[in-house]
């Protein structure tokens, strides 16, 4: 070993990655045929956080020596970490041709399929790794995560327990074990697991969020609210934790824990008065005061957070609004022959309505508008819209140059109390005889035309909807009272409405 090589190794072992990199790069220049020097240079770039540069040096090493297993496995992992899943799969498979028992290649290939949400394929590679090396923590924790995604919570708990036994200091293992126990309905076991995670890392806000969920399952609202508040505080007021805390307050209020909720809602408002989620939900819960619409920042932040899991959550709620709107479309336009129209999906979300609206749209005639960039990314992936706009819907309708033959809006008006400006904007953006089909949540609780429910959503009376449509110039074609979704142990009812623009 040369003196420079020894120096490079010592720097790397001491965590002095920049100095190590300088030495390895010099060695690589002096000995361009040494793939191990190139791999070591890549390792330094990786340790310094430059994954792209690391991948470049691993690729150089692979080109120098096609049979270098470290070059291939490190290249495959770097490609995975930089999001190039196709290359990550290719190089992992090449590594396995060199060594069918390469644990890094097997794990990385499993990770590729996990990222693609092909969980059955991911399991295959994680199992191989676990069989080759019994007691391998990485394989056990990955198996636990994958079974959890497959909703096999018993298997997830088994592998999470194994992972925790292998590494008792793993927060990930304990939280995964706790979440699997929650799903299995073993709430005391969940509390024990989350408590162990909190002992290891008392600064992680998500652990307190999980503790809050476990206490909530046991109807221990005092403990649930205190841990939910700790999650907000320890996160420094992170938006996801504000949203979770708002829903926790709502659910606690439904369970008659009003005295606790009021105090926390007021404290929440006092501590974070400028946050749109806090302003909207806190006021709804503490004193019922509200603006005529939910703040755009509140709506945007809520759906940006929920976007990746939005459709899975809706499925669990038996969400029916898109199907109900499709039923109205079929009743109005028929099953087979129907006009081709320019259509706006107002508050398109992830594109649940866009999937069936496409066949009603004229050439390049389906547009979607939504406040949430996160939701629009999910909608774009469906490749059904010709145009997607990130904007508040009333603002878009008031300023758009085109005129639509149809505007559809599923479960969006529940974030608007006073619908007068919206209906006026809809009327202006529709062609003569154009239609709007939408859903609203029913106000069966009082005599107000609309009011802000403790859920943070607005409820509307049927009489108000009918009266305002007629005042705006619409002809009410059809209105039907329907169950829209579940919420906790309750059913949420509302109206599906179709109205046609009259006049010039």
Name these PLM-found stretches.
Residues 13, 47, 81-82, 115, ...:
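Register position in tetratricopeptide repeats
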Residues 398-407:
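A short acidic, Gly/Pro-enriched loop at the edge of an enzyme's catalytic core
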């Amino acid at each position: 070993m040369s003196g420079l090589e020894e120096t490079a190794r010592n720097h790397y072992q001491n965590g002095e990655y920049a100095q190590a990199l300088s030495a390895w790069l010099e060695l690589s220049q002096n000995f361009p045929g040494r793939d191990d020097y190139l791999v070591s240079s890549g390792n330094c770039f990786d340790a310094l956080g430059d994954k792209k540069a690391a991948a470049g040096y691993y690729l150089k090493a692979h080109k120098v020596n096609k049979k270098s297993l470290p070059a291939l496995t490190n290249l495959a992992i770097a490609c995975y970490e930089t999001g190039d899943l196709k290359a990550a799969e290719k190089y992992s498979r090449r590594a396995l041709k060199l060594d069918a028992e390469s644990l890094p290649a097997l794990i990385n290939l499993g990770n590729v399929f996990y990222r693609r949400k092909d969980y059955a394929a991911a399991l295959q590679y994680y199992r191989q790794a676990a069989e080759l090396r019994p007691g391998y923590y990485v394989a056990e924790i990955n198996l636990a995560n994958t079974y959890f995604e497959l909703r096999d919570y018993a298997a997830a708990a088994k592998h999470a327990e194994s992972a925790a036994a292998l590494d008792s200091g793993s927060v990930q293992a304990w939280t995964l074990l706790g979440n699997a126990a929650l799903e299995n309905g073993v709430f005391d076991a969940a509390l024990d697991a989350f408590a162990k995670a909190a002992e290891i890392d008392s600064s992680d806000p998500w652990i307190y969020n999980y503790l809050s969920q476990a206490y909530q399952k046991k109807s221990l609202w005092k403990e649930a609210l205190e841990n939910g508040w700790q999650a907000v505080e320890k996160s420094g007021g992170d938006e996801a934790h504000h949203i979770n805390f708002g829903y926790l307050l709502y659910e606690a209020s439904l369970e008659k824990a009003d005295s606790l909720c009021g105090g926390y809602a007021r404290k929440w408002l006092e501590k974070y008065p400028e946050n749109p989620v806090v302003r909207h939900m806190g006021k709804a819960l503490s004193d019922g005061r509200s603006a005529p619409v939910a703040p755009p920042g509140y709506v945007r932040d809520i759906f940006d957070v929920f976007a990746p899991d939005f459709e899975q959550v809706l499925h669990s709620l038996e969400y029916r609004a898109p199907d109900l709107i499709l039923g109205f479309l079929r009743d109005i336009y028929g099953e087979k022959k129907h006009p081709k129209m320019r259509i706006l999906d107002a508050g398109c979300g992830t594109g649940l309505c866009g999937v069936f609206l496409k066949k009603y749209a004229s050439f390049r005639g389906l547009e979607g508008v939504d406040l949430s960039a996160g939701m629009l990314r999910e909608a774009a992936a469906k490749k059904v819209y010709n145009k997607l706009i990130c904007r508040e819907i009333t603002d878009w309708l008031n300023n758009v140059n085109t005129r639509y033959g149809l505007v559809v809006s599923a479960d969006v008006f529940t974030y608007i109390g006073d619908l007068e400006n919206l209906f006026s904007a809809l009327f202006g953006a529709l062609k003569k005889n154009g239609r709007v089909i939408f859903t609203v949540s029913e106000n069966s609780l009082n005599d107000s035309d609309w009011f802000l429910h403790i859920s943070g959503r607005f409820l509307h009376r049927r009489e108000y909807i009918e009266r305002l449509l007629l005042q705006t110039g619409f002809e009410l074609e059809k209105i039907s009272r329907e169950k829209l979704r579940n919420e906790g142990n309750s059913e949420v009812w509302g109206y599906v409405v179709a109205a046609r623009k009259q006049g010039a």
